[in-house]
Amino acid sequence: KTNGITFRRWLLSCNRELASFLSDTIGDGFKKDADKLEKLLEFADDQAVLDRLAEIKSEKKKELAAYVKEAEGVVLNTDSIFDIQVKRLHEYKRQQMNALYIIHKYLEIKGGKKPSTPLTFIFGAKAAPAYVIAQDIIHLLLVLQEIINHDPEVSPYMTLLMVENYNV
């Protein structure tokens, strides 16, 4: 639980397909007791369950990509790994650490170490006007977005999107 938001709220409100599948697979107990999600371990080798989970994940990534295309005009590779951090920007919320990781991955790609699966980093953030460090981190992310997305050697393997109309 963080800032009063629980996984149940996001799961039950934002991913009804997954919530429904979980209910069908392990029962409704997880809605009140997160420990009940451990029942999923019983299906770790069940290919039908794994296939359906992958299908739901793929559908949701496509929905997000369609939204981003409409709202931001950016086409996302839904076969990439999505790493998303959308929240008010603050030093303790690790956006800066994530930016440093992105720089590390960028330098690895430039050095010839290409990831086996492309990476997509999505940020949505705002900060108080007087919070200079947070404003600087947003600026860093915007500069990284420009560099990464326009580097023909890197952009096939990594994309960075700083959502313009952050509204959480």
Q: Where are the regions that the model predicts?
A:
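Catalytic cores of carbohydrate-active enzymes across secretory and cytosolic contexts
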Residues: 2-168
